[in-house]
């Protein structure tokens, strides 16, 4: 049976993660390991609810059921998230390999950020004679950003260059913040530093674009360097001078560490993999031939990708629609299964959507009462397939992650993310992937669009529930809480259809009128009169427990009797009259409002003489007035 390895990472760092997993994929022994990659897409631009919901993906796995854990530190920008992950890993009691984050008891594999950044800065100072340096940093708490900062400081000090806090801006890894800072801080190109040193390639590319859009500068007019050696940095013009962190080699080292552990041996506790400075056009060097080759390769790939882009978009749109158009939880499940189990697909051979049981209760509970940031132990398998074989299980335990998984065959990589509306967790989904495809946006696109569809679905469901409640209130008598005249008119139309189709062959109508309501109101007040009506209604409802009761007038009620109430109608009506007599005989035990007097009349449907239900109602009404007249003669109170 294959080993299960949990990989905890941030989805926005997909390219570095992809390179790392490519090293793992290449060097893992065949049919030896499956990798469950739990991806959070939390960023500094998210509100707190969304950040916490994204981070909950690391709580989905029961880590002690895995054989090892890999914490992919780059991109884990929130210290509280890092602390939580490390705590969960410690509690699991299994081997932990930490990439880029040192922690007691964990095997550490790191990229030598310092060495690569030092090479880059030395190059800018020595070859390009840069003396005024500016660092667009990540976040203050991020180790990688701070190690790169130390390399800049050390290089500046060695060359006698002033570099202080005013030469650092913390972007929180957000390009927008970097752009705003540069626009407000530098009024003209004359104020620019000799080089913008950026904590990653994305910040570097954004800075380069800003130079052209805002300051109308050509690439040769400003020097910009990045870090990471992302695909975009190679094909961008100018290609970025940057640092390759050699994540492929780090992935290879991680596999070597795992193999050593599983062989019962002790691997090295700490390994540093050298980074590599990569010269590009953005620093002023001439390497256009290599960059042009990269761009041609990219263009060819884009032409191929564009052929499938509309197909993928159409598939995701269909999935969105399947969720949004569902008017109930069961309808959504059916819609998704119909879509996913039929026809061709763009989501790959392995794909699962799991629903949290809370989705069944969305319409039943008020929104404030729904559990927040909460995971269930069991999840419903809405749709699932592994290697194009449909899942047969309806539920999956969280400890298994994937249902019906024999854990045999080729090594697999599963990408896993939460589905949520703000801090309401709706479930999780899984997409099988190759290491190379992790850098593509398919997984994040599916996740974003499903989350968005859930927003519309849940809001629609809540609105439908609210409308139903309002409709129910419109059909409910406010005093007695039985159905009112509006509901009665609606009900008898539907009931008449059942009679016509033969679905309802036997029934009776019981008509009731409360006696002496005016006497109670005049003698004891209207509050007592209201209580008198409620007590009368309760006696009717308690008598005919299995039949609908309607208040059709101020002191008039009607019930349509069928099934057991129809069969036992005479005995039930007699018991109601007996109860009224018992209360009258024991006046000292009851309040005046409880000693009720109700005239009643009953009529049974006769298909030979009754053309419709109103004919039966009218007969019951006549019988009721006949009894009312008799009761008045008998001086009922």
Where do the model's predicted regions map?
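Bacterial carbohydrate/catabolite-sensing allosteric modules
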Residues: 1-317
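Catalytic core regions of nucleotide second-messenger enzymes
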Residues: 266-271, 503, 550-553, 580-600, ...
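Short regulatory/linker helices and ligand/cofactor-binding micro-motifs at input modules
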Residues: 306-338
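Signal-transducing coiled-coil linker helices
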Residues: 311-315, 335, 426-478, 486-497, ...
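Helix-loop-beta substructure at the N-terminus of cytosolic sensory domains
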Residues: 325-369
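A short, aliphatic-rich beta-strand micro-motif
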Residues: 403-420
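Conserved long alpha-helical elements within nucleotide-processing catalytic cores of c-di-GMP signaling
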Residues: 484-508, 515-542, 550-554, 558-559, ...
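Catalytic-core segments of nucleotide cyclases and related cyclic-nucleotide turnover enzymes
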Residues: 526, 569-577, 588-591, 603-637
